[in-house]
Amino acid sequence: MPYSLEKTDSLVTDAEEKILRLKNDLSVKCGGKVNIITEIKMAFTVIGELANYCSSQKPYAVVMGTQGATALERTLFGSNTIMAIKHLACPVIVVPPKAKFHTIKKIGLACDLKKVDANIPFSQLRSLITQFKAELYILHINPKGEKGYTAETTTETRAIQNMLYDLHPHYRFIDSDDTEIALEQFAQTNKLDLLITVPKRHNIIDKIFHKSHTKKLVMQTRLPLMAVHLN
C-alpha cells in the first residue's frame, strides 16, 4: 500500500528533527569548527540515492554505521553499509557502534598481493597516510597449508615497496584460514586505528562481508573500516 501524503510528511518531519539533533551534537563535539550541511532525501533505495549524491557532490568519503536502535534498523543499516561498500565509487568508511574516536596513527591495508600495480589505489593511499602522518601496515593473510612466500609474493611485495618506499610500510604475513578473525586479532594486538580494504570480485572484501558470521564480526568490531575503490 503506498504511503499517504500525511504519512510522508510525518516521516520527513521526524527525520528533520533527528538530523537537527545530530547536527547540533556534532557541532558541539567539533567545537563549531566544522561546517555541517544537512539534507534529507526521499528515495526508493538508499544506495541509489547515495550514488546520485556522490556523483553530484564528489565527497571525499561516505561514512556509515552498522547498528540501529531496533533489530530491523540493525539489519537495514548493516545491509545498506555492505551494499554501499560494494557499489559506491567513492571511499566508504564504516564506523562500528563500539568505535571510539582518537587520532589515526596506525593504518592497516588488507592486501592479497595479486597484481598490486593494478589493484591498489596508491595515490589515495599515499594521500591518506601522509595527511594523518600515520604508520602503514601491509597485511597479507595466507591460508594454512598453502605456500606463503612464493616468487609472486616477493615480486608483488617489492612492487608495493617501490611505490611506497618513502612511507616505510611494515609488512605482516599471517597464516590463517579465518581471514576476518586474523585481521581483527592483528588490529587489536597492534592497536590499529583504521583498516583499509580494496573491494574487488573474489577478493578479501568478499571474505569479510559475504558470510553471515563475518558480517556479525564486522558489526561488532571496534575498528573503523575504509573501503577504497580503484579509480
Protein language model features and the residues they cover:
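Glycine/threonine-rich flexible loop motifs
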Residues: 71-76, 205-209
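Charged helix-capping and loop-helix junction motifs
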Residues: 77-80, 152-157, 209-214
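Anionic-ligand binding region
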Residues: 119-126, 160
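Structural beta-alpha unit
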Residues: 24-62, 164-215, 219, 223
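Short secondary-structure boundary segments
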Residues: 66, 140, 198-200, 229-230
